[in-house]
Design a protein with these regions (language model features):
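Iron-sulfur cluster-binding electron-transfer modules in prokaryotic oxidoreductases
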Residues: 1-165
Length: 165
């Protein structure tokens, strides 16, 4: 059963989009708005904490995780174009910080972009005449266990020929 359609969506841009490659975040906003979503980018969001946690410094990860989760409180859905960052928060924030009821409420509303679009964007009219391939994101497939949504989204784009790697 599809969850109720969210009204107020926040975009978790991630450090990568903020500092190096904004294209995926900008494209995500464009698609979400085409779906009729009101998209906000909370200015107080920070990092998911993955660099510190993966380096063995959970105490350094805690404040950025706490700040990021607090920034997203009150949104119906939080969408991120980065499976790695989504997976970090959803599956591993608990390794660095106490998960309070408020934090869990935010974590329960986090979506990786392709999961969100395949759930709520079935009526999008997507067209791209191209041959493409798709490489499973290591963290998205391992942290989130997600391999289906990206291919499902690609299958909904008219004109695409998908060649598996």
């Amino acid at each position: 059963m599809t969850p109720p359609r969210p009204e107020k969506v926040a975009l978790f841009t991630t450090c990568l989009a903020d500092f190096a490659a904004p294209g995926p975040a900008l494209a995500a906003v464009e698609v979400l708005e085409a779906m009729g979503m009101e998209v906000e980018v909370p200015p107080r969001q920070s990092c998911c904490g993955q660099p510190a946690l993966n380096s063995g410094y959970p105490a350094a990860a805690k404040p950025v995780i706490d700040q990021t989760l607090a920034a997203f409180d009150g949104y119906d859905a939080i969408v991120s174009p980065a499976g790695s960052c989504t997976g970090m928060l959803v599956k591993h924030a608990k390794d660095a910080t106490e998960i309070t009821e408020a934090k869990q409420r935010v974590l329960d509303r986090m979506w990786e972009f392709t999961q969100f679009v395949t759930t709520y964007g079935a009526d999008l009219d997507l067209v791209l005449d191209a041959t493409v391939t798709y490489h499973d994101s290591c963290h998205m497939s391992r942290f989130l266990g997600e391999r289906t949504s990206p291919r499902l989204l690609l299958s909904r784009i008219k004109g695409i020929t998908l060649i598996e790697m």
